[in-house]
């Protein structure tokens, strides 16, 4: 059996439904050789999972997924930080700011959904998930109120409401610099979702991002059609960018429907670990942060 990995998952600390322990246990059940917990705008899930993964013998790659903006590009981009020191003071400070910013943007989105005839509030989303009032929390608040039949119906509504929401406060260049300062690598998540004139990003787009310090792209993703995967894998090779992959598992509406469904070879981990080792030669996985005190 070829060892496989998953470098993109979510827990209850963002839009996921599983605890860090549950997602780690499922990774072990699947026989994964490495896992990254990459919650939106915060690393609570990854930090909580460090000790659990170490005790249970799983390589846990420290991770986070920032919502960022890129000047000249309309819409929000998701930027993965992998291998970084999640206890870094700069990371912790920006986490707090980014979480506040995101909740304000979700409240704005709820306002637009209300205008569209789906009366929803950020407080109702908090009632679903007090840790992170995100897209899935809003969707299930709508289901609970009988506004929609299921959470998947909300996907269409978001395509109408979310583009009206102001951009994320965190600039991609600053986020890349932050990740590097914490000893990690910066990877654009699911690049096939970002378009210019309805076309995939080109070599020029990735060259511009690499000039800002981008380290890699997520060319393996469960929603990525094979032609797009080939496109981005080719661009990554031409640009000397790392290739990563993940299921983007959230656990909604129930269970782990995506982890392990599409094997992601762990050979992709080699380049990532080599890059992190160059940035943080004194560190090795799994990182021991037990001396840093309780999570806050």
Predicted features along the sequence, with ranges:
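An N-terminally biased module of ancient metal coordination in phosphate/nucleic-acid-related enzymes
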Residues: 1-76, 156-159, 164, 170-171, ...
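Low-complexity, compositionally biased segments
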Residues: 9, 18, 44, 81, ...
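Extended substrate/RNA-proximal surfaces in nucleic-acid metabolism proteins
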Residues: 52-208, 267-287, 294-296
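C-terminal appended segment following the main domain
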Residues: 222-296
């Amino acid at each position: 059996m070829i060892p496989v990995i998953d470098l993109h998952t979510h827990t209850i600390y963002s839009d996921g439904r599983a605890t860090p322990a549950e997602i780690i246990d499922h990774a072990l059940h699947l026989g994964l050789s490495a896992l990254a917990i990459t919650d939106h705008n915060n690393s609570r899930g990854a930090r909580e999972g460090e000790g659990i993964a170490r005790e249970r013998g799983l390589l846990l790659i420290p991770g986070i997924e920032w919502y960022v903006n890129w000047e000249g590009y309309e819409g929000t981009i998701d930027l993965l930080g992998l291998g970084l020191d999640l206890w870094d003071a700069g990371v912790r400070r920006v986490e707090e700011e980014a979480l506040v910013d995101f909740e304000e943007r979700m409240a704005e989105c709820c306002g637009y959904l209300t205008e569209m005839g789906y009366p929803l509030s950020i407080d109702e989303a908090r009632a679903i998930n007090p840790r992170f009032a995100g897209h899935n929390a809003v969707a299930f608040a709508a289901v609970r109120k009988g506004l929609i039949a299921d959470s998947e119906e909300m996907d269409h509504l978001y395509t109408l409401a979310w583009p009206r929401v102001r951009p994320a406060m965190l600039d991609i260049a600053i986020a890349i610099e932050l990740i590097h300062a914490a000893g990690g690598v910066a990877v654009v998540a699911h690049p096939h979702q970002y378009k210019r004139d309805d076309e995939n990003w080109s070599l020029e787009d990735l060259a511009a991002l690499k000039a800002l310090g981008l380290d890699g792209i997520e060319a393996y993703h469960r929603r990525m059609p094979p032609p797009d995967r080939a496109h981005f894998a080719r661009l990554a090779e031409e640009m000397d960018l790392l290739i990563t992959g993940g299921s983007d598992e959230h656990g909604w509406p129930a269970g782990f429907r995506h982890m392990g469904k599409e094997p992601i070879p762990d050979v992709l981990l080699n380049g990532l670990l080599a890059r992190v080792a160059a940035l943080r030669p004194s560190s090795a996985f799994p990182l021991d942060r037990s001396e840093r005190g309780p999570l806050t």
